[in-house]
Amino acid sequence: MEIQFKDGLVPVIVQERRNRDVLMLAYANAEALELTRTTGYAHYYSRSRQKLWKKGEESGHVQRICRILVDCDEDAILYEVEQTGAACHTGHASCFYRTVEGEEIAGLVFDPEKVYANKGE
């Protein structure tokens, strides 16, 4: 299988294995994908910070990998995970917690000000 990286990155959709909720969309480069495969925990590449990161490295809200799938065009990845805590840095279980009209449809799982205090997030 030959993953199609565009500009060195591939989009990664993240889904909770237990209830199939979509948790987030992120990007991985080849190194992040390899770290994910070898460690069993989700790693990504931050486009804004230009660096690798392990999900939960600061918050403790890690994503344990259950399975990694690739789409039919081999240009997108799906991580099926068991999420510890919340996936979104805003404190929501999923990054998809509001409608396009701005209505919040899910409450906070944690207080991000407490979790990321003094960590620069």
Swiss-Prot record:
Binding residues annotated for Zn(2+), in chain numbering: C72, C88, C95
Primary localization class, coarse: cytoplasm
Keywords per UniProt: Amino-acid biosynthesis, Cytoplasm, Histidine biosynthesis, Hydrolase, Magnesium, Metal-binding, Zinc
Known cofactor(s): Mg(2+); Zn(2+)
InterPro entries referenced in this protein's UniProt entry, alphabetically: PRA-CH, PRib_AMP_CycHydrolase_dom, PRib_AMP_CycHydrolase_sf
EC supergroup of this enzyme: hydrolase
Pfam families: PRA-CH (PF01502)
Similarity annotation: Belongs to the PRA-CH family.
NCBIfam families: PRK00051.1
Protein known as: Phosphoribosyl-AMP cyclohydrolase
Gene name of the encoded protein: hisI
